[in-house]
Amino acid sequence: MSSSAIQVAKTATYLPDLVEVQRASFKWFLEKGLIEELESFSPITDYTGKLELHFVGSEYRLKRPRHDVEEAKRRDATFASQMYVTCRLVNKETGEIKEQEVFIGELPLMTERGTFIINGAERVIVNQIVRSPGVYFKDEQDKNGRRTYNASVIPNRGAWLKFETDKNDLLHVRVDKTRKINAHVLMRAMGLSDNDVIDKLRHPEYYKKSIEAANDEGISSEDQALLELYKKLRPGEPPSVSGGQQLLQTRFFDPKRYDLGRVGRYKINKKLRLTIPDSVRTLTHEDVLSTLDYLINLELDVGGASLDDIDHLGNRRVRSVGELLQNQVRVGLNRLERIIKERMTVGETDSLTPAQLVNPKPLVAAIKEFFGSSQLSQFMDQTNPLAELTHKRRISALGPGGLTRERAGFAVRDIHPSHYGRLCPIETPEGPNAGLINSLATHARVNEYGFIETPFWKVENGRVLKQGDPIYLSADLEDECRVAPGDVATDSDGAILADLIPVRYRQDFEKVPPEQVDYVQLSPVQVISVATSLIPFLEHDDANRALMGSNMQRQAVPLLRPERPLVGTGLETQVARDSGMVPISRVNGTVTFVDATAIVVRDEEGVDHSHYLQKYQRSNQDTCLNQRPIVRQGDPVIVGQVLADGSACEGGEIALGQNVLIAYMPWEGYNYEDAILVSERLVNDDLYTSVHIEKYEIEARQTKLGPEEITREIPNVAEESLGNLDEMGIIRIGAFVESGDILVGKVTPKGESDQPPEEKLLRAIFGEKARDVRDNSLRVPSTERGRVVDVRIYTREQGDELPPGANMVVRVYVAQRRKIQVGDKMAGRHGNKGIISRILPREDMPYLPDGTPVDIVLNPLGVPSRMNVGQVFELLMGWAAANLDCRVKVVPFDEMYGAEKSQQTVETFLKEAAKQPGKEWIYNPDDPGKLQLIDGRSGEPFDQPVAVGYSHFLKLVHLVDDKIHARSTGPYSLVTQQPLGGKAQQGGQRLGEMEVWALEAYGAAYTLQELLTVKSDDMQGRNEALNAIVKGKPIPRPGTPESFKVLMRELQSLGLDIAVFTDEGKEVDLMQDVNPRRSTPSRPTYESLGVADYDED
């Protein structure tokens, strides 16, 4: 295939840096966030006020990380840097100042690709979307159908304050969901007189009722108000005026306990039209009075007051890595502060130094906890470059301080008009997380306040101004403008052509003349996410199928020989580059050296820059990471040019699958219900062969009876089984292993107690030689095979950190080539997925008039009801492109160039292809897009013409090799004694309620009985049945299932007198077969067989 690519639509497809959201946030943390946190804790004073400890936050420094990224991955270490900060200890009495640089902990650093290496594994911190701090006005209906209004002041941290109106026109306030307090009681407690409040309100007559109500309760002074406040907030404690004063002060006016944050202050100022400076982050009297005033205006429906929509993106903000990390550092410093205060009090004042006061442990623990176990710190999805990129751009509403799946209603998950150009309306998971986990749109960025912005071109007097940089608007700013879509037709000068333009204004659609348009959207792609924007002809697909297509592209396995799509969207190059999977030239220069492992570029000054390539490394998902050079020695390169292809890349573009010849027709029922019929060519030519690398690990531990040994001398193992092991008993690199082969030989000492006297005598004569050991080697699990590509040995002597009790750890990496086979899952880019049902010899496949057999036969019934017609456009466009020997880039939403544009474009291309000599059969005007296929088995043409073409098809990571599973005897659950579930637990197949109904309907009583008893949880019965099978005797009658006993016990624990009786009325003791000191074997016990037990034959 030639590398020329024809761009069909002329839309700007350059995108901003796609990992910017991660990098910029971490950079902010290092430059500002960390300093801010350190300085907010300074100074720490002891309880007597004599000593003060100051952190000089701006003078913190980071040491060089101990290991670089590759080394950290290899050693299972964390890629982190040590933090040092200058501390000053001031003695107030003597005026003495001690200054010292103190170690305060390790900070994991972000790699260039926006990830973190924690304990050797690459992790990503997902962005979280939460409700923005600020003031929110809502209305509620009481049970009589009357509307009441309320206002909540939500801080970044601290107590919530909620004002409410009621049916008697009284104002109340709640602090943190406690009991209602008359609003005027709070005003008086804050030291405001009646006139102070009344002067501030635009409609004081409404408020006077609340003043009267407070007076009626006998609360007329500040002291009485403080007492009342204390009673309501701390019921059951003796109230005091000073207590009330302190409570109010700490709850709302103490910066340590109450913080609106920059965002909260900005939002409150904006909503209530205040001008309080950014630095005031606690509540002020002005905030409270303005909130009351706004609430009264809402109640009276005057003064332009409006309610807030909490799902609007102007009221939700994104917390990225930097801020999440900052919050975690605050938790650590809080714990540290307590320790420092205690040490100041306990220690000798004169001899104390800052280093003795500061203990790095709490901060280290807080940071470790965040990266290791937070819901937002996730194991990176590395299946392919797109999966990696999408993971870094993910935005989750779950996590600490966010929503939970169970509580999230429909409104939160729904698409909101303000998502336009900010969050993708398509890419979200199916299932319980739908709508809670979103993806950032292609052009969106997060501003300094954490609100998502999207770019527009300015429009003046009906002319689109495309000079300079576009203007970024956040959701609440955009609401006030009239915004036209990106596909409005303009002339060469930028003047809008139509008389009336559809625009979005205040979350509604209207049509206005061009002069009234304020902004135009940048590109049609800016509404959707990166994964969705890789789907060609997206506009012809139903949204549900586009969602599946976006999600399945992330599950495509990198193939042995990737191939770029014939029909792309023009964003493939940037996705490959920004994912970090492809090495990029850092300078302008010339390539001076290339081999499989390194590329050297010499810049204009004559300095060499080396780029080392990844070779056959294992990804987090066991796929293979490998880089192949695409430049040659002597090639000139420029900054930013791709030097090598990564996994699932070709020619610097992302290439997730293969372009294969597809026919839409039924074939002997083999493509019923989305099944896929494929040609043997895909297997033989390795089109869909992928490399998977599995990691096996074994540790030699210190046991009570002595150390385990990694050795070649394994008892009762034939010499030929040891052929591939080296002198230490470890497999050699390059060996081919089958299931059951030894990878690492290991022996464990056996117990001494069970030794007969003659053994002891031999031991005494020949010394320790005859020591008893057990074979405990690492073997290749069943169903696995492959070639050993790497062996790593970790010991204490080399300075590796090993788990407690281990003397040595050995890791073996085995790579396997997996060809495509029946049971594997495949999919196109339009949500058209299926399982391979049969692999047909190529001579039996239907073939084209020129004799080419097709590669895949899909069911045509998969298209109409699912409404993903994009696949048909792709098919025919690919057919034309393949015959014209070119590649095509189709930008989504091309109907801006005229109605039915996609169809016209495809038809034009097909006619062009048919003009070539000998290719006129490609396009039949009577049946455009269809060909007469011939049956490979009989040589007869098929009845009807068939749609045939080239489509980009992916092999997904759900491989049948990893799913197929069988169980003979295995572990049981502790309580119910039923077999466990799942392949990892060696589980059984669940026989559920519906399966039981099916057997009941057939009257298959004995089959059903044994399925529910001896094959499941009748403990005695299953042991007896096993012995009977081994000895060849008839299987005894089943007993009582364990789960029935559990049910009986549960009913008895509810206080019900329930028991089981025989027909004669005699009670059955269910526990008779259970030993009182029952230690159930979790596996069945085999009785030893005597000679007499064997049958004669």
UniProtKB/Swiss-Prot annotation:
Tree of life domain: Bacteria
Keyword presence, Transferase: yes
Keyword Cell cycle listed: no
Family matches, as Gene3D superfamilies: 2.40.50.100, 2.40.50.150, 3.90.1100.10, DNA-directed RNA polymerase, beta subunit, external 1 domain, DNA-directed RNA polymerase, subunit 2, domain 6, RNA polymerase alpha subunit dimerisation domain, RNA polymerase Rpb2, domain 2
Catalytic reactions of this protein: RNA(n) + a ribonucleoside 5'-triphosphate = RNA(n+1) + diphosphate
One cellular component term from this protein's GO annotations in UniProt: DNA-directed RNA polymerase complex
Keyword field: DNA-directed RNA polymerase, Nucleotidyltransferase, Transcription, Transferase
GO terms under biological process: DNA-templated transcription
Family: Belongs to the RNA polymerase beta chain family.
Protein name: DNA-directed RNA polymerase subunit beta
Organism: Synechococcus sp. (strain WH7803)
Lineage: Bacteria, Bacillati, Cyanobacteriota, Cyanophyceae, Synechococcales
